[in-house]
Design a protein with these regions (language model features):
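Catalytic center-proximal scaffold of phosphoryl-transfer enzymes
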Residues: 1-141
Length: 141
């Protein structure tokens, strides 16, 4: 509400803003459905999730992308319940590129690949905290 007022100078009630959001959601539903079907046909999908706080509670932004098309979903959970509710991964049969979270490995109809960015982050932590030579060499690969 405050953002709309700051941008437009109009003061809208929360109910009015919520109505606009719901109308927009309904109008975009067929586009989202088509986008999901397109992603399901791709040979590889990258997935990740990141937490953020809303009214003192953690919410999770789940991202599914093929590099050209990205869908984002907000869910109060991070793991299996969110994956099931979103419904893309349970239907996906290609290669899932992920951060190695246990919740992804329940789905054996797809193959799994560790995300390179997450791997580099882990190696950096190992080098910084322990100075292991093998981790430093792995980062150079």
């Amino acid at each position: 509400v405050a953002l709309v007022q700051a941008i437009s100078g109009l003061r809208l009630s929360e109910a009015t803003c919520l109505g606009y959001v719901r109308s927009l959601h309904d109008a975009l539903q067929s586009w989202e459905d088509a986008a999901i079907e397109r992603l399901l046909e791709r040979p590889a999908l990258h997935v990740d999730e990141t937490g953020f706080r809303v009214d003192g509670k953690t919410q999770w932004l789940h991202v599914v992308t093929d590099g050209a098309l990205t869908l984002k979903f907000v869910h109060p959970k991070r793991g299996g319940e969110a994956i099931e509710d979103i419904g893309i991964i349970p239907r996906y049969a290609g290669t899932l590129v992920d951060d190695c979270r246990e919740a992804y490995f329940v789905y054996d109809q797809c193959s799994h690949q560790l995300c390179g960015s997450h791997l580099l982050r882990e190696l950096t932590f190992i080098v910084d905290s322990n100075g292991f030579r093998w981790a430093r060499l792995m980062k150079k690969l």
